[in-house]
Amino acid sequence: MCGIVGFTGSAQASPILLDGLSKLEYRGYDSAGIAVRDGEKQAEIVKSKGKLSELKKKTNDGEAVKGSCGIGHTRWATHGEPSTLNAHPHTSDDENVIAVHNGIIENYQELREKLTKSNYTFISQTDTEVAVKLIDYYYKKYNLGPVDAIARAMIRIRGSYALCVMFKDYPGEIYTARKESPMIIGIANGETYVASDVPAILKYTRNVYYIGNNEIAKLEKGKVTFYNIDREEITKELTEIKWDAEAAEKGGYEHFMLKEIHEQPKVVRDTINSVIKDGKINFSEIGLTDDEMSKISQIYIVACGSAYHVGMAVQYVIEDFTSIPVRVELASEFRYRKMTLVKDSLVIIISQSGETADSLAALREAKEKGIMTLGIVNVVGSSIAREADRVFYTLAGPEISVATTKAYSTQLVAGYLLALQFAVARGEMTEEKCGELLKELYTIPDKIEKILEDKERIQWYANKLAGAKDAFFIGRGIDYAIGLEGSLKMKEISYIHSEAYAAGELKHGPISLIEEGVPVIGVLTQQELYEKTVSNMVEVKSRGASLMGLTTYSNYSMEDLADFTVYIPQTDSHFAGSLSVIPLQLLGYYVSVAKGYDVDKPRNLAKSVTVE
């Protein structure tokens, strides 16, 4: 992995490839490369280690590499160290077949040994070079065409992959194939684009095809032909991407993350409005009926990372509003557990990209067991969106920063809306009560805007926190779930060691980590748990901790305890997480800025984890 872009048309390919790759930088990478063909000439390949700027220098921003057909790649090392040699594209021995690849080929060592016996030589440590030479093997040995050669290779390869391949004998054409790893194809004005994610081509077209699992596509100027793995031609419908191209730009902000934090009021409002008709929740577009909801006996929420933290918060809300027991599971663990899923269950899969490998595998596991699945995703046409029985689309738009903010917030409100409608459908909440809570939910975007007005105070505290070696977050109930997200933000972009604990668990071990000056951030928005969490904060303060209190207006006694206090507007306690998470996002952001780090592209991380 991590980013793929391809183009064939009349324009010069290199600038388009470099521009597309720059839109995928948020996915994380350690090297980059392009291969471009000028008519029937041999492809010119340029690769570099490090930032994309190095590749741009080598190619004079693409002007030095001529041709109207090409493929490009940003690599995040999985097999082989980060280096120019291991960077993509990779080629056959005679350079007549060239390819880039996302994913992991699990049996690459076995295939490499067999190809070596057939006199192929390998110069890199990558599994991608194995894929290229396997395609070349079938292409030459059996005198096959590109589609047949790729299909034969796909049958032999085990693992996940998205491939873009060029053949010297087929100028102006790009061949793509995928299994489990995302790939989209765009078309506009007689030109054709391919990419691993929407932002790479959004500037050029909003009309895209989604290439399915175990499918192959042939790209020509303004034309795409699709095949299944049996080499039979298949038809597909174009999908229009609704995202605004400007949403994938910084728009005057220093970082995408800060821009996306400020976009949260709008995207939360849009997501709420997407399922409200005549003042009531309407899930007709999701396809989830009241009758189905009334029969659900158990809910499993399955996700990874921040989406898992969403699930933890939503669990409390659903269980408060309904009598349905809810279990929240890490997708990477769920799929391997020998658990019996309760009949009439619902498995909710939460994923911004809709391509998260472990979440997708968990969805398939649930479907195999005959359990209804619901995807909460942000990308229309993504794998989870296509395969889930029901889909709730969040309207966050393109999220570029690796650290999620606005997608998290839209997932959270999607969870609230599900909880409310489950309660009404099951007769556990009146329409009147639901209407009152909806009215309060509609105030959340305005209250987020009010919190953002206080960001300078949070920046001041972040500057003091930047020198910390450790940081701890504590809370109870929903506040604990929000603390987990705040802790993740801190560690993933500021590289400060950070952990979150249920406040009641401090005395069972974690309190031994508290020493003089260590920052402890307490989240206290659940009024019935306020005094208990305060007592835990008193415990850590007595052992030398420096306290930040995050609570609602009216809890002014926090001033007497904490060294720094952030207040959020009052709201229904079930929805408080949508407000309390905002200062924690800002805190993580400003600590990272104070330390001089690349906020949008933290080390060792990728935006969309499409391998296991």
Specify the residue positions occupied by each region the protein language model found:
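Conserved short alpha-helical segments that host acidic/polar catalytic motifs at enzyme active sites
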Residues: 1-250, 254, 266-297, 336, ...
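Structural beta-sheet core signal
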Residues: 4, 99, 165, 176, ...
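Glycine-rich oxoanion-binding loops at beta->alpha junctions
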Residues: 68, 72-85, 275-290, 314-350, ...
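Generic C-terminus detector
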Residues: 231, 546, 559-561, 571-612
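Active-site phosphate/pyrophosphate-binding segments
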Residues: 264-268, 272-300, 390-519, 592-612
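Glycine-rich phosphate-binding loops that contact phosphosugars or nucleotide phosphates
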Residues: 294-436, 440-443, 523-568, 587, ...
